[in-house]
Amino acid sequence: MLPSIAKHAALHQVNPLKKHGQNFIFDSSLCDKIVRASNLAENSRVLEIGPGTGGLTRAILQKNPESLTVIETDERCLPLLNEIKEYYPNLNIIKQDALKINLTDLSCDIVNSVGFAYKKREAKPITNRRANDIGESKSIDYKVTIISNLPYHIGTELVIRWLKEAQLITSMTLMLQKEVVERICAIPSTKAYGRLSVICQLIVKVEKCFDVAPTAFYPPPKVYSAIVKLIPLENSPSIALINKVEQITKLAFAGRRKMIKSSLKNLVPNIHEVLTQLKINDNYRAENLAPQDYLRIAEIL
């Protein structure tokens, strides 16, 4: 029988390191709550980034997924995770920096019915052409369910990467800094609304699940966290269009107090005519336009 999460970490002398952005969760009830929020189906193929001491890992495995692949960069955690694997052979452990792995580099083939086969090759950036090729695929052999307590310092970057590979994902249930979750879920004309809100809401359905107090972690961070669930939309825009939206929103929100006709005039010389055609008030500021408004502008460019 496995020891408690905290005792297991102590036995292996695994203490959180700042350089890895580690804040461990020892509360098994919180881990269970996160997994319940994901509505994880049996026989799912799950991906977890940064399992650390394995609290969330255990909660996922108790739901009997077909496989759970964990990506961990901290060598100190590997013996601990391997002990969990002795009880759950459907656990696959990959030592790697999560920022060096794309979902398309995780093969759909199952190795001996356990986890994903990771093709050890240099991780390639998502280019327009490559992403479009992915999006145009007629059939995808597998989809992954992502459940993770993401390190604050890489959380937003990982989310943006995964959005561009959303066709490979069933859902994402993520713990992030509360401020980031509020930005993801923000509606137009609010302070938190920005580029991240626009891009996310064009690609996924967003749902904030619950807040997590700093006291839930060891050591306690200085800020609150929150759980957000992201479910890819069936008919999301192409990567080419999303890249245009990124370009437009970068300019628009750089001067969020400027009127949109001023912010975009260098990118769209006939911006007044475009806004008139789309029936968008040209006195609006960046925060007043809905995600679909930005998409409609991108479609005209």
Curated annotation (Swiss-Prot):
Catalytic function, reaction form: adenosine(1518)/adenosine(1519) in 16S rRNA + 4 S-adenosyl-L-methionine = N(6)-dimethyladenosine(1518)/N(6)-dimethyladenosine(1519) in 16S rRNA + 4 S-adenosyl-L-homocysteine + 4 H(+)
GO cellular component, as recorded: cytoplasm
EC numbers: 2.1.1.182
One Pfam entry name: RrnaAD
Database matches in CDD domains: AdoMet_MTases (cd02440)
Keywords: Cytoplasm, Methyltransferase, RNA-binding, rRNA processing, S-adenosyl-L-methionine, Transferase
One Gene Ontology MF term: 16S rRNA (adenine(1518)-N(6)/adenine(1519)-N(6))-dimethyltransferase activity
Function comment: Specifically dimethylates two adjacent adenosines (A1518 and A1519) in the loop of a conserved hairpin near the 3'-end of 16S rRNA in the 30S particle. May play a critical role in biogenesis of 30S subunits.
Protein name as it appears in the record: Ribosomal RNA small subunit methyltransferase A
